[in-house]
Amino acid sequence: MLGLFRKLLPREDRFFDLFADHSRTVMGAAEALNALLAGGPDIESHCDRIVALENEADEITREVLLAVRRSFITPFDRGDIKDLIQSMDDAIDMMHKTVKTIRLYEQKSFDPGMQAMGAAVVEAAHLVAEAIPLLSRIGANAHRLSAIAEEVTHVEDRSDQLHEQGLKDLFQRHGASNPMAYIIGSEIYGELEKVVDRFEDVANEISGIVIENV
């Protein structure tokens, strides 16, 4: 009877399938955000894609949290699973918030610094996408997982510099002559910086999981 009951519950490896699915939505949204920041006629389609992927990511997050409650066995601590998936979801939520700002102010072109930050978002998303499947064998992959977390931190450091330089450039161009352009630009820069910050949060969660399980 117990064996039959266990078969009805989520498998341990189901968590890694869900993590991978969520990571793919985050990666897709990062690539769409980067393409959006290039400007051009397809801005709205890129915005729509990010919104759709964010909705998909929310559904996956709910599946993970439900599986945590229903499972006898989890691959690592339940709290760590919850914190990991929610940190990943926060990253795509922040991309969605950036889209809302871009649509609100009807922005059609973006500064080179914003485009560079879009590339940083893609780089961070790629690193997280590499890390997620490695969590299925933490001991064997501990060194690479730690290295990935460090690489994400470096990406975030570069993003900080791009953010600061972007605000400076905006002020020099618009600070006195067009305050509204400065306000809008600084808001977009700030939200892009927060996207990269959320990826650093994911990296920190991964580092914590490695420390607790090796």
Curated annotation (Swiss-Prot):
InterPro entries recorded: PhoU-like_sf, Put_Phosphate_transp_reg, UPF0111_domain
Pfam assignment, any one: PhoU_div
Origin superkingdom: Bacteria
Similarity comment: family membership: Belongs to the UPF0111 family.
Role according to the record: Could be involved in orthophosphate transport.
Protein name as it appears in the record: Putative pit accessory protein
Organism from which the protein derives: Rhizobium meliloti (strain 1021)
